[in-house]
Every structure is written in C-alpha cells, then in structure tokens.
C-alpha cells in the first residue's frame, strides 16, 4: 500500500460568521494556514466540521471550497455519511465529481440500525463511487460500534474500503485493527490523546481536530516517529498532551473553536444548538496554549 494515504489529517472545523452562516473566507484562510504548517491532508464536514448542523447544500459547498483552496497541495477526504443511504450517495458522488481523493463515511445514525443494515449501507455508498472509502467508527454518536470483527467483514465485502478512522477511544480495538488488517487497509485513529500511541502501534496516521489549532506541532511528532527518533517524539508529545486532554474532556468542537479563538484564528461560534466553551475550560485551554509558546492574551500564535 505504498500509495496509500498516511500522516496527519486535519478534521477541518467549519468557520461560521456571527450570524451562523458558513464563513467561506475564514475557511479558505484556515485551509491555507493548515497546509502551510505541513499537514498531510484535509477532512472537511466531519464531526469537528459540525456536519450535523449543515444542510446537504452547505456540505457540498464546504467541500467545493476546501478542494478549490487546497488546489492539489494535499489530499482532501470529505466526510459524506448521512442518516439515509440516498443522501450519503448524493454527497459521495458530489465529492468524487468535485475532485476528492477519497471519502469518509460514518455509520448511519439516529435510528438503531442492525449490523446487517449498516453493512448494506456501506456497500451501497461505496459502490456508488470509484474512489476509496474510509469507514468512520464513532460509536458514541452513531450507537453502532464497528468492531474489528465487523470491519474485517466489511473490508472483505467492499472492494474500495481502503481506510478506517477509529474514534471509539478503545485503544485495544485500534491495535487489533492495525495488527489484523493493517496490511489490507490503512488505520487512522481519531482520538486526540491516543495520537502518539497509535503511531507507535503502527497506525497510518490520524484524522484529528486538534490540527485546526496546532497542526505544525502534531506534524513534528509524526515526523519524529517516522524518523525513528522516539525520544524526540515523546518529548514533543509530553508538551502537547495537556492540550489534547483538555480537548477530549467534553464539548470537543467547542474546545477546538475556543482554542482557535484564543490564538487569534477564530472559527466563529458553533452553529446552534452548540454553544461556546465555558469560562473554566477556556482558562484551561489558555494555560495549555501558553505552555506551548502561544500568547493567548495577545491572540498571537508563537510557533507553528
């Protein structure tokens, strides 16, 4: 799988204006900043991108803007999963037409679908496109846990399922995926605090919302691992870990946008019903960013 996607992929936040409209100018700036910091790829319209609050038309427009602004500099893997197979197929085909490298697809959610129904959904959506598919396991949101065994069945049944993003937070499951299926699919881990552990275990990379805030720092950890400099990787990760822990402690997207605001790169508010990060967590974020060399008081990014 020499040509497979790998590295640090940003789970791109969707900037909104004060009126909660998609801020295309802010989105373009975010894409440029992230790519300039060395990120390896972009995943728009995922959970961090607040896809559940976007209309299908808005999701398509965000994908168009991201692919246009990336301009071939890095791969773009839009999330195209939806509650219905019909909508997921429409979004997936649009992403392929627009120039996506691959698509990421979460399991259908809200209704408690069976494993058989979920597998059929994946087969139908993947079969509607010719580009690779990344299965997105997010059991806390979907109510369906794509265990290594279930994913193994999907991998054997869906020819273009080439990637898995595991955001279960279950490291043992991620490790099983890596060791049992890593020669067939590339495994990305999406739980921020497991970033280094997953890389050391052999993950292809990570799709991570923290890349909206500290893209360069995450790439530095990844590069150290790739170079075999584990001492440096652990040193860099030790500094980053408090910020990662603050992100996953609750209200993830609010924390990401709060941190973006603190460093002077505002993503705007969460779209309703999401709210801003509370003052206590904002202070924790502020202190974590200060320890990394940022100056949140001045809203200045000290280092990429």
What is the meaning of each model-derived region?
Residues 20, 164, 285:
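Residue-level signature of catalytic and energy-coupling elements of molecular machines
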């Amino acid at each position: 799988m020499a040509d497979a996607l790998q590295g640090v992929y940003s789970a791109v936040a969707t900037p909104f204006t004060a009126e909660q409209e998609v801020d295309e100018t802010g989105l373009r700036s975010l894409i440029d900043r992230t790519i300039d910091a060395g990120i390896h790829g972009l995943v728009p319209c995922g959970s961090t991108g607040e896809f559940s609050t976007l209309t299908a038309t808005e999701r398509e427009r965000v994908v168009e803007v991201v692919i246009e602004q990336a301009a071939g500099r890095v791969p773009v893997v839009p999330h195209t999963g939806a509650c219905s197979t019909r909508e997921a197929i429409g979004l997936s085909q649009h992403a392929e037409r627009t120039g996506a490298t691959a698509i990421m697809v979460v399991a259908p959610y809200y209704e408690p679908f069976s494993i058989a129904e979920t597998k059929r959904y994946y087969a139908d959506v993947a079969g509607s496109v010719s580009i690779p598919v990344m299965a997105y396991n997010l059991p806390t949101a979907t109510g369906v846990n794509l265990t290594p065994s279930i994913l193994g069945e999907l991998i054997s049944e869906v020819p273009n399922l080439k990637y898995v993003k595991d955001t279960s937070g279950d490291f043992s499951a991620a490790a099983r995926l890596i060791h049992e299926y890593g020669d067939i699919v590339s495994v990305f881990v999406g739980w921020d605090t497991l970033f280094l552990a997953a890389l050391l275990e052999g993950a292809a990379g990570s799709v991570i919302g923290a890349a909206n805030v500290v893209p360069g720092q995450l790439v530095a950890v990844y590069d150290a691992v790739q170079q075999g400099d584990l001492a440096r990787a652990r040193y860099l990760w030790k500094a980053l870990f408090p910020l990662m822990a603050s992100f996953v402690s609750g209200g993830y997207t609010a924390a990401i946008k709060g941190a973006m605001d603190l460093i002077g790169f505002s993503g705007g508010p969460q779209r309703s019903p999401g709210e801003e990060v509370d003052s206590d967590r904002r202070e924790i974020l502020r202190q974590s960013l200060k320890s990394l060399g940022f100056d949140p008081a001045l809203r200045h990014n000290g280092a990429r």
